[in-house]
Amino acid sequence: MNLEILQKKKEECRTWKNVEPWFLQLKEACKIEKSNLKIDYGDWFSIGNRADLGDEEYEIIVQTAKKLIPWRKGPFKIFDLEIDSEWQSNIKYNLIRPYFNLKDKVVADIGCNNGYYMFRMLEDCPKRLIGFDPSPLTLHQFEFVNHFVKSDIVYEMLGVEHLEFYNHKFDFIFMLGVLYHRPDPVGTLKSLARGLNSKGEILIDTFMIDGEEEICLTPNKRYSKIPNIYFIPTIPALKNWLERAGFENIEVLATTITTSQEQRKTPWSFDESLEDFLDPNDSSKTVEGYPAPKRVYVKARKIM
């Protein structure tokens, strides 16, 4: 597979009719050059203060952030402008944070969205940090934030299927909220294994259903109004998938029920969010009648 051709898409996409307005607005924001800005790696990933900008500069920041709506992951605070994303991604990050040490490691984030988790990971001082996501919108959101952060994070407009062909292997791979979008979950986990160095580790989360049987739910057409949800396993079924893909030391870190504290509508998001995806008369079910979203977080190590 020739990744160079695929990587050129990163630049070519900027001329697409729906993408060009984002790119042109981003270019305006990137004319603002500031150095030695204060960075806060907390729940609100923050860069700079309002006092760092003149009025015209701040207005460009506001207009750029608004042009790049919807912001699904965050929250961010850019020169004190609060971008309150649909997902409070700090909740997930704080949950998994005790389970990894990225210092001096080569790290990948598959389905990295706008890079919120990667910006938080900078505090861990990884050797190299690379995000994979084919979305032009989230690429521009990432570049907007990173223009001021000035990190060495690499953002590749590639998917998990390209991981094993990348030009080097990884010590640690995150794949959060991706597996249920893949029609071949075992094949996807095998791609992660092939992208790892020997004894490398993964940390994933995915939708789950309760039960001790080795089975999974296969939604018909949509799940929680999402069309591309293919397989939702029990924990025993997920462990089987991981073992078949070449992983050992499989550790269940946590299970959580998605709440409106974590996912909700904001002025920076889509018109619909979690409350619109659940049965209005029974929040334990989706609008389609399936069990409401529940997630399992798992860490595992490559066998060889």
UniProtKB/Swiss-Prot annotation:
One Pfam family matching this protein: Methyltransf_9
GO molecular function: transferase activity, transferring alkyl or aryl (other than methyl) groups
Signal peptide coordinates: none
Record CDD domains: AdoMet_MTases
EC number(s) stated in the UniProt entry for this protein: 2.5.1.-
Gene3D superfamilies documented for this protein: Vaccinia Virus protein VP39
The organism's place on the tree of life at top rank: Bacteria
Example GO BP: tRNA wobble uridine modification
Keywords: Transferase, tRNA processing
Catalytic reaction annotation: carboxy-S-adenosyl-L-methionine + 5-hydroxyuridine(34) in tRNA = 5-carboxymethoxyuridine(34) in tRNA + S-adenosyl-L-homocysteine + H(+)
Residue numbers binding carboxy-S-adenosyl-L-methionine: K73, W87, K92, G111, D133, P134, S135, V160, E161, Y180, R295
Described function: Catalyzes carboxymethyl transfer from carboxy-S-adenosyl-L-methionine (Cx-SAM) to 5-hydroxyuridine (ho5U) to form 5-carboxymethoxyuridine (cmo5U) at position 34 in tRNAs.
Homology family: Belongs to the class I-like SAM-binding methyltransferase superfamily. CmoB family.
Complex formation: Homotetramer.
Protein name per UniProt: tRNA U34 carboxymethyltransferase
The encoding gene: cmoB
